[in-house]
From Swiss-Prot:
Catalyzes the transfer of the phosphoribosyl group of 5-phosphorylribose-1-pyrophosphate (PRPP) to anthranilate to yield N-(5'-phosphoribosyl)-anthranilate (PRA). Anthranilate 2 binds at residue 166. Homodimer. It is an enzyme of class 2 (transferase). InterPro entries: Anthranilate_Pribosyl_Tfrase, Glycosyl_Trfase_fam3, Glycosyl_Trfase_fam3_N_dom, Glycosyl_Trfase_fam3_N_dom_sf, Nuc_phospho_transferase. The gene is trpD. Mg(2+) 1 binds at residues 92, 225. This is Anthranilate phosphoribosyltransferase. Mg(2+) 2 binds at residues 224-225. Its EC number is 2.4.2.18.
Length: 340
């Protein structure tokens, strides 16, 4: 029964990671009444979710996701929480594609839009990626093209059990924090952008609890990614160590640009803006934003020694049009399989 755990939350006390995993396993398998679920989510929100609770909920979602074979090699994901209120171009999606063209294996987990007019799924779909490809097809994309897209609704069907309550409550809950943490392929390396500075350290501690080999959590002057318009807060996770510092465009050998210079549009417009970037023909601010975030992922995954070297690798790849070749190759593999 959940009542003793609810009582714990009502008293302002935290659940353990294992307790939260048990609770959320019941939620995503449809075993929790909507009124109880509403109380649980509200109590967690008022108390403030701990890293242990967030990690426990994420573990439950991963354990109950549609299975996908995890590679033995290292691979990464780069994702933002969304919800930063700015309609920027798809920086993390473009950075994923660019990093993949520089030798990083990237399994991009994503959904339709949250904060921008065009989410990662919208963009990958515009490039011809079959969103409802099978897990086996996604794994083949990663093996052959260095890049795959994992469309969240394909893997996390259990989330539907919480949707009526989430829709009724009309407020952020722990579920809004889980999207970046529940990649069903379970990457070894992770770069997460968060929408508020106060989330940087809790997310870093959560990633530690989830056992990532290396990870970065960033917040860039109001954005859920590294910023070209100002300084970015960063916490780097390396096993048991947490290293907190600030990054600016100059650390990547890049110029600063105003926030307005990286605003996006509807999916078709975004697709063209990103296609130009991937082909080395993008606007200077767009190219810098993508190079900065791709460069950080490239360094995190050990392909570059410094952030500046990572950004240069990203720019060189874009000018050689390699990212465009990668997304086209991955999309072709995704379409070569039957629909699940």
């Amino acid at each position: 029964m959940l009542f003793p755990l609810l009582e714990t939350l009502y008293q302002g006390k935290a659940l353990s990671q294992n307790e939260t995993t048990d609770v959320f396993s019941q939620i995503v398998t449809g075993q929790v009444d909507n009124i109880i679920l509403s109380s649980l989510l509200t109590a967690l929100k008022i108390k403030g979710e701990t890293p242990e609770e967030i990690a426990g909920a994420a573990t439950a979602m991963i354990q109950n996701a549609s299975p996908v074979k995890r590679p033995e090699y290292d691979f990464a994901d780069i994702v933002g929480t969304g919800g930063d209120g700015h309609n920027t171009i798809n920086i993390s999606s473009a950075a994923a594609i660019v990093a993949a063209s520089c030798g990083v294996k990237v399994a991009k987990h994503g959904n339709r839009s949250v904060s921008s007019k065009s989410g990662s799924a919208d963009l990958f779909n515009a490039f011809g990626m079959k969103l409802d490809m099978s897990p086996a097809a996604a794994r083949e994309c990663l093996d052959k093209a260095n890049l795959c897209f994992l469309f969240a609704p394909v893997y996390h069907a259990g989330i539907k059990h919480a949707m009526p309550v989430r829709t009724t409550l009309k407020t952020r809950t722990i579920f809004n924090l889980l999207g970046p943490l529940v990649n069903p392929m379970q990457p070894s390396h992770m770069m997460i952008g968060v929408y508020a500075p106060e989330l940087v350290m809790p997310f870093a501690r959560t990633l530690q609890l989830l056992g990532y080999k290396k990870a970065l959590v960033v917040h860039g002057s109001g954005l859920d990614e590294l910023a070209v318009h100002g300084p970015s807060m960063v916490v780097e996770i390396d096993g048991d160590a947490l290293n907190e510092y600030t990054l600016s465009p100059s650390d990547f050998g890049l110029e600063e640009y105003p926030l307005a210079a990286i605003e996006g549009g509807v999916p078709d417009e975004n697709k063209q803006l990103i296609q130009d970037v991937l082909a080395g023909e993008g606007q200077a601010a767009h190219e810098a934003a993508v190079a900065m975030n791709a460069g950080a992922l490239i360094k995190l995954c050990g392909r570059a020694e410094t952030y500046q070297q990572g950004a240069k690798m990203a720019i060189d790849a874009m000018q050689a049009k390699r990212p465009l070749q990668v997304i086209e190759a991955s999309s072709a593999v995704s379409r070569s399989h039957d629909i699940i």
